[in-house]
């Protein structure tokens, strides 16, 4: 059995997404993590915040934080899914 490391992924979502669309987006990423064997998934919607500087012509955006345990393969799949999703403005994954 492979060792699971703890990770935190923070992603910034376009402000024009509705609450329902944002909830579906969050659920899809949680489902992706669960399918690939991630454990202890904790997701926090940090709400809509003003950005310190403009990112892709946006002054504010929704912040979502996910903490979970997984392996490197899970991180690669999650980040690949975020790269192709046009609703994601920016994301960052760190080991904790």
UniProtKB/Swiss-Prot annotation:
It holds the Pfam family Ribosomal_S6. GO terms for cellular component: chloroplast; ribonucleoprotein complex; ribosome. One of its GO terms (molecular function) is structural constituent of ribosome. CDD domains: bS6_chloro_cyano (cd15487). SUPFAM superfamilies: Ribosomal protein S6. One of its GO terms (biological process) is translation. Binds together with bS18 to 16S ribosomal RNA. Transmembrane segments: none annotated. The keyword Transmembrane helix does not apply. Its main location: plastid. InterPro entries: Ribosomal_bS6, Ribosomal_bS6_sf, Ribosomal_S6_plastid/chlpt, Transl_elong_EF1B/ribsomal_bS6. It is found in: Plastid, Chloroplast. It comes from the Eukaryota. Belongs to the bacterial ribosomal protein bS6 family. This is Small ribosomal subunit protein bS6c. Keywords: Chloroplast, Plastid, Ribonucleoprotein, Ribosomal protein, RNA-binding, rRNA-binding. HAMAP family: Ribosomal_bS6 (MF_00360). Gene3D superfamilies: 3.30.70.60. Disulfide bonds: none annotated.
